[in-house]
Amino acid sequence: MRQKAAAECGVTLPAAFRFVDLSLENPTDPGYFQEKAFWDANPRAGELDSYPTLGSLQDVKHPVGDADELVKSGDWAIQGHADYLPERLAAVHASLTNTSGPPTIFYAHCNAGCDRTGEFFGAYAMSYLGYNVTTAMGEACKQCGRCPNYYATNSIGWWCLTLEAQGRTDVGPCMDFASCKPLGDCTAHNATPLEDDCPRLGLGV
């Protein structure tokens, strides 16, 4: 990991750090139970935070039901509770900004590294790094090599609307940043990814 960070982005990891494997996978994913077994057997190597993520079946452009009520309740997500993004994003942010111990390094992933990962990182970046939705989507597409799928892209849109409902005025076009085939692939509209492939940004507030 140290060699990869240095080779790909010129980043030198600290001598001591807390390593967290942040898994967005579900029990139906290949390798889910093997990953859990590894961390159970190797607790000194790091820790596993399991954040099962399902995304949204609700098309953010054409929802079934009242969009404002879906945002308020979080029922736009398959598992409700806004896909548990509020508490999960806050927990990650608290760990990243905690200066009372060694720094925390999160290795967040799903199965492909594009869809649920794109949803989670996109939501975090909009919440804490000041990204608007076209930058969040642009980075998700660029870093993976393809755009997040229907479930994840709609989640990004719903999270954008959630932030807008909380008073954010800088999140961009929450309902017009992408187009998706029904339950399939998505294409970004006017994506604005960062120029740096290895962005070095503050942690936000």
What is the predicted function of each stretch?
Residues 1-112, 119-205:
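Cys-dependent protein tyrosine phosphatase-like superfamily
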